Design a protein with these regions (language model features):
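Elongated scaffold/linker segments in the mid-to-C-terminal portions of large proteins
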Residues: 42, 47, 55-58, 76-108, ...
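Acidic, glycine-rich segments characteristic of secretory precursors and extracytoplasmic regions
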Residues: 4, 8, 20-71, 108, ...
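Short, surface-exposed recognition loops and adjoining beta-strand edges that mediate ligand/DNA contacts
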Residues: 34, 61-82, 163-165, 200-219, ...
């Protein structure tokens, strides 16, 4: 079976380049390293393998966008909360550089970079019977995937080694200097703009979830937004909204149906990962689904929402009900009865259940990845959203507010709330129109949390809006969690210990990033 050298930093960028990983188990047959890149079919198979790295399968079907990524995007914020081991450490800001979620996210994200580098370099050097158009199309998708991975790495870790080619000598990668976020942005923006010219507006059939013009424009716009370059961001976010005007995208009128398993590719989807139970099923339902629930059975509630964040939803917002709470479990509570415990959402400050047959929830599971499931098998058919139209509309609200003020942002903010059935700003007396740019930014940030919860957005959002330390410290106080005060140095996570042992630049940087 064909295996591609995997580029991971330090233990990745050194030992990882001598390790191997299957790119796509059903496509490679008897290919070897020497004969893997001969035909156009070979390159398309390798490309599919790089897409698969976003959501490794089988065996690692919980890594990167299949769930693990949430630990460095929605945990270490006010959203994610778990009660055991390394997830608890991420929840309460007591993590260290040996935390498995830092180590494994780093490893799997760099796997995308490395495999994209390998295929791109082989593609550029290959003499293969392929049209120039098809060659450019494969390259454009690889550049998009590599750019997405670098965006995710720099969101989490800031400066990282910029690796753009296949490493013939892995030892040369040891102790690589760190490249600034600005320089990495310049590199991936160039790649993305080249890809934008080549990628189609949409794909069909089995290629439906591949990278498109809309996906590339969304990523470009969000990279500019991260740098607070709202003028350039507007150009690319407006491109995506123009595609909506052409009928490429539209908002599903029911926010819940965005997540129905039968709705594999939602009309508002811009870039996503599709699953089929029988071929490439995921484990996202296992990790995000409710524990001991009568309708969604056999799930673990491993990743869940903090109760203080859930309480921020207005009671009149239907999205507040899109979680699992106040239900009777299916597992008998003891050997004397067939009845399960009642899992109750506690009132704020309530610490004691009303009786011995009730358990107070410590966190709450979202319905996003288990809504109207078609199958109750271990592997699920849930779709994982990476970019969707609601996100882009809220990006537009943020851009307009920062360029033109609250009035220009209001229609876009209310568009998302209206679709959800939530009270509208300026229509409900409890929600007056935010009068200042600062107040509107807070409203947009809040709305991004409500709409995009557990979609890998929260930590980058809080940092971009300049609200990370304030929000997380207030959250820790409300949770009565002591011992850590979040500082600006903690906006970037510590580099994994496995990497710092082989990279002096990371080792020198890490102490200030650790919780104190």
């Amino acid at each position: 079976m064909k295996k591609i050298l995997m580029g991971l930093l330090a233990t990745g960028l050194v030992s990882g380049f001598t390790a191997c990983t299957d790119l796509e188990p059903t496509l490679y047959s008897n290919l070897t390293t020497s004969n893997a890149y001969i035909t156009e079919k070979d390159f398309n198979a390798a490309l599919v393998g790089v897409y698969a790295d976003l959501n490794p399968f089988p065996g690692d079907a919980w890594q990167y966008y299949a769930g693990y990524f949430v630990m460095i995007t929605d945990y270490t914020t006010d959203i994610g909360y778990s009660t055991s081991s390394d997830p608890l450490a991420m929840s309460v800001m007591s993590y260290d550089s040996n935390n498995q979620y830092l180590r494994d996210n780093w490893r799997y994200i760099y796997q995308v970079v490395s495999n994209a580098n390998t295929v791109l370099q082989k593609l550029n050097n290959a003499e293969v019977d392929m049209t120039e158009e098809n060659k450019q199309l494969i390259a454009a998708q690889l550049k998009f995937l590599r750019a997405l991975a670098y965006r995710d790495l720099t969101d989490a870790f800031g400066p990282v080694p910029l690796v753009t080619e296949y490493a013939e000598n892995p030892l040369a990668m040891r102790d690589m200097p760190l490249t600034s976020v600005a320089d990495i942005d310049a590199f991936i923006l160039k790649d993305l703009k080249e890809a934008l010219e080549v990628l189609p507006e949409k794909w069909t059939g089995t290629d439906l979830s591949r990278a498109t013009k809309g996906a590339a424009a969304t990523l470009i716009g969000q990279i500019y937004m991260r740098a607070h370059d709202y003028q350039n961001a507007k150009t690319y976010i407006d491109m995506v909204l123009a595609l909506r005007d052409k009928g490429i995208y539209s908002l599903n009128p029911d926010f819940k149906n965005v997540w129905a398993e039968s709705n594999k590719y939602d009309m508002g989807s811009i870039f996503c990962i599709l699953h089929e139970v029988t071929s490439n099923g995921g484990e996202i339902a296992n990790h995000f689904g409710p524990s001991d629930h009568p309708e969604v059975q056999g799930r673990w509630q491993f990743y869940a929402i903090s109760l203080p964040f859930w309480r921020k939803y207005d009671d009149a917002d239907p999205r507040k009900q899109f979680f699992y709470f106040n239900y009777t479990g299916v597992s008998p509570r003891d050997d004397k009865t067939d009845y399960g415990f009642y899992y109750m959402m506690p009132e704020k400050g309530q610490n004691t259940p009303p009786n011995d047959t009730t358990k107070l929830l410590l966190n709450v599971a979202t319905k996003k990845y288990t809504y109207e499931m078609v199958s109750d098998l271990y592997y699920d058919g849930s779709t994982i959203s990476i970019f969707r139209l609601a996100d882009v509309i809220l990006c537009k609200a943020e851009i307009e507010n920062n360029l033109n003020g609250p009035g220009a942002a209001l229609p876009y903010l209310n568009e998302i709330r209206e679709r959800a059935g939530a009270p509208l700003y300026g229509k409900d007396p409890r929600f007056p129109v935010p009068a200042s740019q600062e107040a509107m930014n807070q409203a947009i940030l809040d709305e991004r949390g409500f709409e995009l919860v557990f979609e890998y957005k929260r930590r980058p959002d809080l940092i971009r809006f300049g609200k990370y330390e304030e929000t997380v410290n207030a959250h820790l106080k409300e949770m009565d969690i002591t011992g850590t005060t979040v500082t600006p140095d903690m906006r970037y996570l510590p580099y994994p210990m496995t990497e710092t042992k082989l990279n002096s630049y990371m080792e020198a940087e890490n102490p200030k990033r650790l919780p104190k």
